[in-house]
Amino acid sequence: MEGVGAVRFWLVVCGCLAFPPRAESVCPERCDCQHPQHLLCTNRGLRAVPKTSSLPSPQDVLTYSLGGNFITNITAFDFHRLGQLRRLDLQYNQIRSLHPKTFEKLSRLEELYLGNNLLQALAPGTLAPLRKLRILYANGNEIGRLSRGSFEGLESLVKLRLDGNVLGALPDAVFAPLGNLLYLHLEANRIRFLGKNAFTQLGKLRFLNLSANELQPSLRHAATFVPLRSLSTLILSANSLQHLGPRVFQHLPRLGLLSLSGNQLTHLAPEAFWGLEALRELRLEGNRLNQLPLTLLEPLHSLEALDLSGNELSALHPATFGHQGRLRELSLRDNALSALSGDIFAASPALYRLDLDGNGWTCDCRLRGLKRWMGNWHSQGRLLTVFVQCRHPPALRGKYLDYLDDQLLQNGSCVDPSPSPTAGSRQWPISTAPGEGMTPPAGLAQELPLQPQPQPQQRGRLLPGVAWAGAAKELVGNRSALRLNRRGPGLQHQSPSAAAASGSAPQSLDLHEKPERGRPTRANLPQTEPTPTSEPASGTPSARDSWQRAAKQRLASEQQGRAVQYDSGVGLPPLVSDPCDFNKFILCNLTVEAVSANSASVRWAVREHRSPRPQGGARFRLLFDRFGQQPKFQRFVYLPERSDSATLHELRGDTPYLVCVEGVLGGRVCPVAPRDHCAGLVTLPEAGGRGGVDYQLLTLVLLAINALLVLLALAAWGSRWLRRKLRARRKGGAPVHVRHMYSTRRPLRSMGTGVSADFSGFQSHRPRTTVCALSEADLIEFPCDRFMDSSGGGTGGSLRREDHLLQRFAD
């Protein structure tokens, strides 16, 4: 045995010598070398670059991370053995200097990160060996000067970060070696002056960030940006710019984003943005602009986003955005605007995001055009919610323009500056012959002012081909709406022969309709405002005076009766012009009347009300869709005026539907969903056709099948458990008579009786058989067959036991 053990020992020794263990790589202290190509030493508290001499193959390392340590100096031999290195990270250290030969062996390096250190300069020639370098981060240092030799040899550089330094100027041709540079970050420095040749040889540059510097107040020299023909993003925000000269960006034909935010601009030359035909986004927020030249934005045909927030704009010309057909986003928030023309955004059909919040809006008749435009754009789903919160007058302070009625915007002292064409308001020249003395009556001097001498209150507009016949009967309260019959061209106060005889040149007369919506009171009813009739004037002052007196008397008597009626509020239904108020107070009782397999009829009620004349009567929009469908209400239909019922066709049988109705006033709908006017219905099953799937029956069948499967599984598990229980009892349990024999619950007497009865034939002089071998300590000899399994059962087993007993106890 000892010889065999010795042989085994020598065999093991020989095997170990023949197959030595594989040598493991030795990683530098405090570093991680789990991946053979990545050497990770980030945030390890290192104060010097670890030695890589212990690495078995340093040439395999491609990434070396040393960021977040306390390294202060880089020697010439720290990376001497890492010739295949592609990425070197030295950020967030305390490096103050770089040895001129630090990167001499790193000719394959592509990414170098030196950001957030204490470097004060990039010595000429230090980076020259890095011919394949594409990304260089030198941000967050203390670099105060640059020279052309700082970037010598970096022909492949694509991205350069120099932000967060203390650069005061850019020397001429400092970036000339970087012919392939695409991204240049110079923000957060102290640059005050841009040299004429600062960006020479940067013809491929796409991104230039000069924000947060100290540029001179005036940017006037266009030659600075001449080399940047491919520039698409220019950021000049957070400087001290105050003026922009004309055509300063004319050499940037591909510029798509220009940011001038956060400066102190107070003046922009009308041609400041000339040549920027490709500009898509212009940011001018946070300046001190109080006006915009009319032709400032004219060259920007491709403009899509314009931010003018945070300035001091108090007014905008209606044609300011007349050339921005692609404008999609416009911000005018936090300015000093009090009114805007309704036509100012008419040339921008793509506008969908408009921010007008934070201005001092004066909600009067000057905002009616803007309100109509907003309503039309909202109803067409082409504009997001615009918040125009009133600041003046005090009675409307804090309210939003789109929820105000036109009656609240009426001001007796304001003139509608430029009616919006979207509302159908056009100015029509009306010819008259002043030679015949046919001027408007004295009582209507305020209602019908001549165009050369506009009066403060212009209160009516006449359509072409309108005669004055019957106008006095249609003048209603202070609304001053002249319902005139269209009979001929112009105001026919005289016969054609008289007009021909006069021979005087006609004058143009502009009338502006200023309807006041709401219930008039006695205070605002005009008391002395005559109405012209169809009777021809005689042309003499006496005839004209008598005509005026008669008209005044008739009008005064009619208005006195109307004033009593208006004050008592009898017989005048409410005037509703807002679709939300119409849905809330006028529309009611939406019910489903008849339902079939493919159609359904709904009916609703409309309370008595009045609608503004320019808007016409109320129309209705019926929305319906299957219940639970997402998105909701993909189908809807517009109904004509005075409709109170509708029938939906082409519905699906045995399907639940949700039907809603809402009012449409002046082409506008309420932006709030009509939840109060909705009803549900379930169409009937299709008769005579192949019925669809009965989902209720299908559900019950599936539930029954699932319950049956559960019961079968429980039954199988129960039977298996019971079978295991019985099998365990058979294997581990003793015969029943043995358990009863040794039971402690049986009395001692009965147990002794049983023993004496069973072994009554015992004879001590007989020899023990080999069948039951007992030890010398046994006091009683038990028959072994009593411990045998009695499960053999049957008559044969009992007979064999009895025969054995007879043979043993024969004597």
UniProtKB/Swiss-Prot annotation:
Domain LRRCT, first and last residues per copy: 359-416
Main location: membrane
A biological process term (GO) from this entry: innate immune response
InterPro entries with a match to the protein in the record: Dev_Immune_Receptor (IPR050328), FN3_dom (IPR003961), FN3_sf (IPR036116), Leu-rich_rpt (IPR001611), Leu-rich_rpt_typical-subtyp (IPR003591), LRR_dom_sf (IPR032675)
Biased composition regions of type Basic and acidic residues, renumbered to the chain: 510-519
Protein location: Membrane
CDD domains: FN3
Gene3D superfamilies documented for this protein: Ribonuclease Inhibitor (3.80.10.10)
Ranges where the LRRNT domain occurs: 26-57
Assembly mode: Belongs to the lipopolysaccharide (LPS) receptor, a multi-protein complex containing at least CD14, MD-2 and TLR4. Interacts with TLR4; this interaction is greatly enhanced following LPS stimulation. Interacts with LPS.
Protein name as it appears in the record: TLR4 interactor with leucine rich repeats
Organism: Rattus norvegicus
